[in-house]
Design a protein with these regions (language model features):
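ATP-dependent carboxylate activation and anion-phosphoryl transfer catalytic cores
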Residues: 9, 13, 39-40, 73-77, ...
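A polyampholytic, Gly/Pro-enriched intrinsically disordered region
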Residues: 33-44, 66-70
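Residues within well-ordered alpha-helices
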Residues: 2, 31-32, 57, 192
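Short gly/pro/ser/thr-enriched loop/turn and capping motifs at secondary-structure boundaries
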Residues: 21-25, 33, 86, 154-156
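Short amphipathic alpha-helix with an adjacent loop that forms part of the alpha/beta core around
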Residues: 56-71
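Short acidic loop-to-helix transition motifs that present clustered carboxylates
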Residues: 49-56, 127-129
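Structural element of the ATP-grasp superfamily
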Residues: 33-37, 61, 122
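A short, GP-enriched loop/loop-strand-helix hinge that lies immediately N-terminal to
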Residues: 1-28, 42-50
Length: 363
């Protein structure tokens, strides 16, 4: 609504991001799933529209349970999701169809409170998977989307929020997989670009995928915005005749102001492996609950392969606010291959100083 409002007012403003029509079409999980299925893009088995009726929801859940049994899955699971949710919010698992109604009611009420929409999605819960993303960029013409590779966001907290990201999503030349990883990467990029062209995508966006242990990709959703982890994709990407790695935020602004893309997929090159660590104020000994207190020392060793993005000062103590996301910093590490990136990542952590005390005075 905001994106539409700023462009429809008497004194129009420019919204830096996809057009409101694109956000309306792809920002909704239901619309995204319908579009994907119409283009033969694989999606997670389950409903392709918001369910508001409890009896209908239970019928769909029962059919998803039965489908998993037919597939030989020993412990079938159903995911109940707020259709307007995101970021891991408004999601709960169901292990037994007899418990479905209570979970459905809980998620429906949560969705109504948080998003003013009690629509609920019913999907198969796929376990033991990789969470991959495809980074897409296109200009206002919507005709020439390009991709800036893939990234793997499988390492997440108990709340399904990302903690470590790696680009590219798979490295088949350096690791062994139980499936054709190169083909999976090729397929999810192809599917993502196909959808972007179909809707005339016109800014920066991310296509999120689940890849099963058997190498089956399923589209989860499209994020019609720049994401926190854009930097790790940018770190391994370059544009011909442009100096250094690409700056995706600068591209978003430039395109948002109406400039043409100015390059094609052939101009985009990739080099090395990037790893991004999120430094989070959380307590792993107590279920990753927010850690509230005072940072007294924050320092790291500067390296040419390291990019640190942070709002936390290094020359004065810092009180961690409770009103905002507990993300303190992003550390982006580059290596010529996965082994070097991992080695450098360990070196960064060994040389990181992050000291402080919680509100009880405990170090």
């Amino acid at each position: 609504r905001f994106a539409r409002r700023v462009t429809k007012r008497d004194r129009k403003m420019i919204f830096i991001g996809p057009s409101w029509k694109i956000i309306r079409e792809l920002g909704d999980k239901i619309n995204t799933k319908r579009l994907a299925r119409s283009l033969d893009v694989p999606t997670v088995p389950g409903s392709d529209r918001p369910i508001y009726d409890e009896m209908e929801a239970e019928r769909i859940a029962r059919s998803v349970f039965e489908f998993q049994v037919q597939q030989g899955i020993k412990r079938p699971l159903v995911l109940v999701k707020a259709s307007a949710g995101g970021g891991g919010m408004g999601i709960e698992e169901v292990y037994d169809i007899d418990n479905f109604r209570s979970v459905y009611r809980r998620i429906r009420n949560y969705a109504l409170r948080q998003f003013k929409d009690e629509g609920v999605l019913i999907e198969q819960r796929i376990t033991d998977f990789n969470h991959l993303e495809v980074q897409i960029v296109s200009d206002r013409s919507g005709k020439n989307p390009v991709h800036f590779g893939t990234r793997n966001c499988s390492i997440q907290s108990t709340g399904l929020q990302k903690r470590v990201e790696v680009a590219p999503g798979f490295v088949p030349a350096q690791m062994d997989y139980s499936f054709d990883a190169a083909k999976v990467l090729q397929d999810i990029v192809h599917y993502s670009l196909t959808m972007a062209r179909k809707v005339g995508y016109d800014n920066v966006g991310t296509w999120e995928w689940i890849v099963t242990r058997q190498g089956e990709p399923f589209l989860m959703e499209v994020n019609t915005r720049i994401q926190v982890e854009n930097g790790v994709s940018a770190r391994i990407s370059s544009i011909r005749n442009h100096e250094g790695p690409v700056d995706l935020i600068a591209e978003q602004i430039r395109i948002g102001l109406g400039e043409p893309l100015g390059y094609t997929q052939d101009d985009v090159t990739f080099d090395g492996v990037g790893i991004e660590y999120r430094l989070i104020a959380e307590d792993p000994e107590h279920g990753f609950t927010p850690w509230v207190g005072r940072i007294e020392r924050f320092a790291w060793k500067e390296e040419p392969w390291l990019t640190m993005l942070t709002h936390v000062p290094t020359d004065t103590p810092y009180e961690i606010p409770t009103e905002f996301d507990p993300n303190l910093a992003l550390a982006i590490i580059w290596g010529k291959d996965l082994a070097e990136a991992r080695e450098r990542g360990v070196s960064f952590l060994d040389n990181l100083h992050l000291d402080g005390r919680n509100n009880a005075g405990e170090a």
